[in-house]
Swiss-Prot record:
Protein source organism: Haloquadratum walsbyi (strain DSM 16790 / HBSQ001)
Region (Disordered): 1-30
EC number: 7.3.2.1
Highest taxon listed in the record's lineage: Archaea
Gene name per UniProt: pstB
Name of the protein in its database record: Phosphate import ATP-binding protein PstB
PANTHER family for this protein: ABC TRANSPORTER I FAMILY MEMBER 17
Length: 307
């Protein structure tokens, strides 16, 4: 991949297995040995590619030399202690860091082998293809129906042209089909189908988060980024979100940040471990990372010796 420098301007089955990580000693970092890791190859196509990614906020470096390939239609978990760069990395994947005026990004991020940081990239289209669900549910203060239909209507994705008229499908019919499909895909339809005109802010926290996922699905993304989507939810609501993520990964590429290592072990095919200093220390098959980590630092983190 070609390297770019970008400064922001806006305010398991075998199909998912990876090679084992190989570390080499390059010097000591505090009491630990820093490991270098090599890229993994997957048996499924790569959806997102990251090469030598550095991120700075002013003079502070948040990510250092991150390289990884994220396979399509799977769940990739990002774990590590607070402040290690997980969310910064996630936000690089659809250029949400553009909104941070002090951010500077060096390196390469590709979507289907196309560089997303090159000049001329349409950010609206990019963020439709790579959607994001945030830590705290953020439904619009509108009806449940309007929350789903807002994006497609704003971007003209509901067909109002000749073909729709020839097929005898009105705008309202298309809208209702979209709303039902997205709510079903987000496992929410059965709970809200008889109150679609109610204000979304009246839903429970777990329902609001699933509505936000449905809203993300309404613009037909290819990748769904999730930043701690269940951290504010109770165990029952969390279980529903985890079940939903498993279903979504059959059709979408899911990348999730979580502080909950048990959650990462339950729902992901591959896991990336970030540690202090914005360093990606280990990345590979989830079972191997948790059961037989190649890095002593990762083993110490997973077993609770630090972090």
């Amino acid at each position: 991949m070609s390297e770019t420098t970008y400064t922001t301007t806006e305010d398991t089955d075998d199909t998912n297995s990876t090679d084992s990580m190989v570390g080499t000693t390059t010097g000591e970092t505090d009491e630990y040995v820093r490991e270098e890791w090599r890229e993994y190859s997957f048996d499924v196509p790569t959806k997102l590619g990251v090469d030598d990614l550095d991120v700075y906020y002013g003079d502070d470096q948040a990510l250092e030399g991150v390289s990884m390939e994220i396979p399509e239609k799977s769940v990739t978990a990002l774990i590590g202690p607070s402040g290690c760069g997980k969310s910064t990395f996630l936000r690089c994947l659809n250029r949400m860091n553009d909104r941070v005026s002090s951010a500077r990004i060096d390196g390469s991020v590709t979507l289907d082998s196309q560089e997303i940081y090159q000049d001329g990239v349409n950010l609206v289209e990019l963020r439709k293809r790579v959607g994001m669900v945030f830590q705290s549910p953020n439904p619009f203060p509108k009806s449940i129906r309007e929350n789903i239909a807002y994006g497609p209507e704003k971007h003209g994705d509901i067909d109002t042209g000749v073909l729709a008229r020839l097929l005898g499908r009105s705008d309202e019919e298309q809208r209702e089909e979209l709303v039902e499909r997205c709510l079903r895909d987000a496992a929410l339809w059965d709970e809200v189908h008889d109150r679609l005109d109610d204000n979304a802010l009246g839903l429970s926290g777990g329902q609001q988060q699933r509505l936000c996922i449905a809203r993300c699905l309404s613009v037909d993304p290819e990748v769904i980024l999730m930043d701690e989507p269940a951290s504010a939810l109770d165990p029952i609501a969390t279980a529903k979100i985890e079940d939903l993520i498993a279903e979504l990964s059959k059709e979408y590429t899911v990348v999730i940040v979580t502080h909950n290592m048990q959650q990462a072990a339950r729902i992901s095919e591959q896991t990336a471990v970030f540690l202090t200093g914005g360093e990606l220390v280990e990345y590979g098959d989830t079972d191997q990372v948790f059961e037989n980590p190649q890095s002593e630092r990762v083993e110490d983190y997973i077993t609770g010796k630090f972090g």
